[in-house]
C-alpha cells in the first residue's frame, strides 16, 4: 500500500517538474511591463529578463531610478515614470505601453510596486496611514491592472502580482498585512474571471528579503514616529517597555532578511516564461518552512502560538 502511495506521489512531482520546465516560444518578441523598478525585486527582474532577450518596459517612480536601470541594461529595455497612486500617470503609462507593443499586445504585467511603512500595531496608526499603504499596495495595483488588461488579453499573456507571506498569515504590524490580503483576493478573483480569455494570473509570496523597503533602521525610525504621535492613553495601555521590546524584536527579525533576491525574481521569471505557471509561488525558506505551513493550521492554534511569542502589554487582562 505504502509503496503504491509513494510511487503515485513521486510520479506526480515528476510530471509537475516536466511540465514546469516547458518554456513558451519566441520570448524575444514578448513585451513585459514591470512596476517598481527603481530598486529591489523589480529592478533585478528587469535586468534578468533583459539578459534573457525579452522586451522589458520598466516603470520607475523617479528619473534617477530609470537612468540607473538604463545604464545597466541593453538598448532593448525602455523606461517610463509611473506613480501608481496617480490615475493620470497610469493612463499615460498605459498609452506609452500601447504604442510600444502595437498589435502584439502585452505578454506580461508584473505588479511589483509596493510600500512598507511603519511596523506598528493598528491601534497606533492613523486613518491616513491605512489609506496611504492601501493606495499603493492594493488600489494602485488594481488600477494598473484594469488599465492594461485589454493589452494582456490581446496577447493571451500573464499577470504577476507581488503579494507577501503576510498575505497568507496575519502577524502583528498594522495595515501592510491587510493590504496584501487584498492583493491575494484580487488576484484570485481576477484569475477566475479572465481564464476563459487565455490569461494566466500568478501570485508571488516572498518571505523576508533585504531591500530598501525592509531597511531595519528606517522602519524603526518610522515606527517610533508613529508611536510618538499615538494618543497618550493608548501608549499607557501598552507601556514603554512593551514598545521597546517590540522595536528590538522587529530590528532583530529584519536583520535576518535574505540578501538573495533572485529567489523571488526566479519565481517571477518562471511565471512569465513557463507554459504552465503556478498559481502561487512561495519564495524564501522562511516562507516555505514557516509561514505557509502556519497558514494551514487552525486559526485558534495560530493565535495561541503568536500570543506566547511576545510580551504582554502593560494593561493586559
UniProtKB/Swiss-Prot annotation:
Localization in the cell: Microsome membrane; Endoplasmic reticulum membrane
Tissues where this protein is expressed: Detected in prostate, liver and kidney.
Q: How does it sit in the membrane?
A: Peripheral membrane protein
Sites binding NAD(+) sit at 33-57
Kindly state which keywords UniProt assigns to this record, in alphabetical order.
Endoplasmic reticulum, Glycoprotein, Lipid metabolism, Membrane, Microsome, NAD, Oxidoreductase, Signal, Steroid metabolism
Q: Where is the signal peptide?
A: 1-17
Q: Active site at which residues?
A: 176 (proton acceptor)
Enzyme nomenclature, EC number: 1.1.1.105, 1.1.1.209, 1.1.1.239, 1.1.1.53
For the ligand (substrate), the binding residues are 164
Question: What is the protein's species of origin?
Answer: Rattus norvegicus (Rat)
Q: Which named protein is this? A: 17-beta-hydroxysteroid dehydrogenase type 6
| Any one GO cellular component localisation term in the record | intracellular membrane-bounded organelle
